[in-house]
């Protein structure tokens, strides 16, 4: 009985931690997509696409980095690869100038919030 309570408590802690990390990623993706859509006067559908693309990037980054004890250089390589993949995904829906403008708007927001 005590072991099952301990296991339940441990699982609860893990799920709360995971949920908090997911909430952070959702907040960040929402902020990025709203800012880019506002700056570039994009449609709601375009904003949703940007949001989903950033969520996929953040989840992929987390999956490839979290708990893997990577060096700083290895983490940077993961981030660089995921940023390249993000740009490629954006180019599926947007032309090159729009993609560049979205990335610039998000970068400006990141710098402003640091």
Language model feature labels by segment:
Residues 1-25:
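Bacterial Sec-dependent N-terminal signal peptides
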């Amino acid at each position: 009985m005590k072991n099952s309570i301990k296991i339940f408590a441990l699982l609860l802690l893990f799920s709360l931690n995971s949920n908090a990390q997911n909430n952070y990623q959702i907040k960040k993706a929402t902020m990025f997509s709203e800012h880019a859509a506002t700056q570039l006067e994009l449609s709601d559908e375009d904003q949703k696409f940007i949001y989903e693309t950033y969520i996929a990037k953040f989840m992929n980054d987390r999956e490839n980095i979290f708990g893997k004890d990577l060096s700083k250089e290895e983490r940077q390589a993961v981030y660089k690869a995921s940023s390249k993949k993000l740009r490629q995904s954006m180019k599926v829906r947007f032309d090159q100038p729009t993609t560049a403008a979205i990335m610039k708007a998000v970068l400006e927001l990141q710098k402003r919030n640091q």
